[in-house]
């Protein structure tokens, strides 16, 4: 399960705020997606995250829920065995099986690994190209492939599936040089949900018996 949370972090390891100038159509699509997403306050998504490596015969899947403040580093990720919290200053990683929560400072630098940026994964460090449309049921998805500007990166390709009508990322697939494929599939997307600010911080009073390891 620790592999899964590490893999989830990999999904958002290449983020921030400037586009690589490679494909005008892809750029226009992503600009619309970014503009719409950043118009929201708090977004809630239910997702499936899968780590797949056929050669190593590894396939792990985890269901989860993400609450994220679209224009900040505040988020909560809830999965079966782990939870992540961030109030923008501190980050908590709660390991349920170990009854332990690790506290660290948030890295607010542009290249920081941050689940809050899952829907803006494409915004820095990538070249990208529009590869066409695919249909699934009644929906049409715009497909965009990204490759890192830095060829030394472990991830060599990212594939985005964007719901054409909703202008939202529906699926992110990452491919790394070790043969791993990471898939983040959005099952539900609920914008502007009302949650208290306390959602984004770990409250030890609600978790009796949990050891707090402060790494700050």
Task: Give the location of each predicted region.
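Beta-turn initiation residues at beta-strand->coil junctions
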Residues: 49-51, 79, 95-96, 173-176
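Gly/Pro-enriched, hydrophobic low-complexity segments
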Residues: 131-133, 137-208, 213-216
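Positively charged n-region of N-terminal signal peptides that target proteins for export
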Residues: 1-7
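Flexible, surface-exposed loop/linker segments and immediately adjacent secondary-structure boundaries
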Residues: 106-139
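N-terminal leader/targeting segments and the immediate start of mature chains
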Residues: 5, 16-59, 71-73, 206, ...
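An acidic-aromatic
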Residues: 65-113, 182
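Amphipathic hydrophobic-ligand
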Residues: 59-64, 180
């Amino acid at each position: 399960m620790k592999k899964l949370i590490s893999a989830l972090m990999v999904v958002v390891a290449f983020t921030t705020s400037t586009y690589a100038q490679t494909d005008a159509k892809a750029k226009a699509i992503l600009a619309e997606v970014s503009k719409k997403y950043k118009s929201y306050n708090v977004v809630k998504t239910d997702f499936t995250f899968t780590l797949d490596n056929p050669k190593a015969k590894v396939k792990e899947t985890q269901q989860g829920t993400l609450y994220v403040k679209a224009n900040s580093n505040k988020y909560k990720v809830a999965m079966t065995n782990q939870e992540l919290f961030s109030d923008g200053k501190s980050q908590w990683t709660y390991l349920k099986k170990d009854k332990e929560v690790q506290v660290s400072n948030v890295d607010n630098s542009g290249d920081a690994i941050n689940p809050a940026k899952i829907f803006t994964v494409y915004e820095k460090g990538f070249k990208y190209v529009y590869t066409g449309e695919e249909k699934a049921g009644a929906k049409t998805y715009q497909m965009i492939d990204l490759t890192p500007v830095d060829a030394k990166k472990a991830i060599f390709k990212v594939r985005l599936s964007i719901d054409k009508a909703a202008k939202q990322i529906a699926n992110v697939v990452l491919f790394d040089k070790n043969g791993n494929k990471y898939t983040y599939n959005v099952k539900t997307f609920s914008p502007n949900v009302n949650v208290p600010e306390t959602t984004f911080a770990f409250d030890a009073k609600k978790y009796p018996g949990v050891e707090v390891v402060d790494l700050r």
